[in-house]
Design a protein with these regions (language model features):
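Rossmann-like NAD(P)(H) cofactor-binding subdomain of soluble oxidoreductases
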Residues: 17-21, 37-107
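Hydrophobic Val/Ile/Leu positions in short beta-strands of Rossmann-like dinucleotide-binding domains
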Residues: 7-9, 52, 119
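Hydrophobic anchor at the start of a short beta-strand
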Residues: 7, 30-31, 92, 141, ...
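NAD(P)-dependent Rossmann-like dehydrogenase/reductase catalytic/cofactor-binding core
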Residues: 182-259
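Phosphate-coordination loops involved in phosphoryl transfer and adenosine-cofactor binding
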Residues: 3-6, 71, 114
Length: 259
């Protein structure tokens, strides 16, 4: 960086703490975090960027408490919200790191490992600030405007949070066979590798991809009834992936109707 930019973070929890550490590591001047003892009207003074890392429900209130500046960029880390929630700040923006940050330390490491970021900004100046963050962290970015923000974040929840829920189901079903979840994690990693190498449709394997409905029926007979609703929903979701692949669509046997 030719110019050392400065940032003040409001709400240094896991995400805010991770951003603070990652930005400090790459040479940004990270000012003291903001807590309740700080006059909120002074948060945006003498700083290039104010980064709001509070829960989504508090972002608008925090932004309104900060005195607007003609030079300071005010941004938030929410994936579901766009820059409009930061009105009346002229240089408002949203930057969402598309990674999981269970702790500040782990998050800081992941932010510097070719992380993807979803960006949106109200002005060229605020977009330039966001792009400098991505560039300095060695990341990659794409723009998601206000109207598509919820779609984007729903996909992120499916790709991350829902995977954890799926593995929770796998863990419970595996326990009935006396098998630990750790035995399945290499399978999970191999599946992610297949998706990266081949794309979603061509990465798919297993009984639904083969049209092996007898095996699906054996699964349904074996697993605990409390898991059936999720299992059936996933079978149908898997069928949709198969149906979207022109290579398999013509040869896939139809699923028998339930009697």
């Amino acid at each position: 960086m030719n110019v050392r930019r400065s940032v003040r973070i409001v709400g240094p929890g896991r995400a805010g703490g991770a951003m603070a550490r990652a930005l400090a590591d790459i040479g940004w001047q990270v000012l003291e975090p903001v807590d309740r003892s700080v006059d909120p009207t002074e948060v945006g003074l003498d700083v290039d960027l104010v980064l709001i890392a509070t829960p989504d429900a508090a972002i608008a209130e925090v932004a309104r408490a900060i005195e607007p500046s003609s030079t300071t960029v005010v941004a938030h880390l929410s994936g579901a919200l766009g820059p409009d929630v930061l009105a009346p700040h002229p240089h408002r923006a949203a930057i969402h790191p598309l990674t999981s940050m269970p702790t500040a330390d782990i998050g800081a490491l992941r932010l510097r490992r070719s992380c993807w970021f979803a960006l949106d900004a109200e002005t060229p100046e605020s977009m330039d600030c966001l792009e400098s963050i991505v560039r300095d962290l060695g990341g990659r970015s794409f723009r998601v405007d206000e109207s598509r923000r919820a779609n984007y974040h729903a996909a992120a929840a499916i790709a991350s949070n829902h995977v954890v829920a799926l593995l929770g189901s796998a863990e419970r079903v595996a326990a009935d066979a006396g098998v630990p979840i750790e035995a399945y994690l290499e399978l999970v990693r191999a599946t992610i590798d297949n998706i990266e190498d081949l794309g979603v449709a061509d990465a798919l394997t297993g009984p639904v991809a083969r049209g092996d409905w007898d095996t699906v029926a054996r699964h349904r007979a074996a697993i605990d009834p409390s898991e059936l609703e999720l299992y059936d929903a996933l079978v149908e979701a898997t069928r949709r992936v198969v149906d979207s692949s022109t290579q398999r669509e013509s040869s896939l046997p139809p699923r028998p109707t339930d009697s």
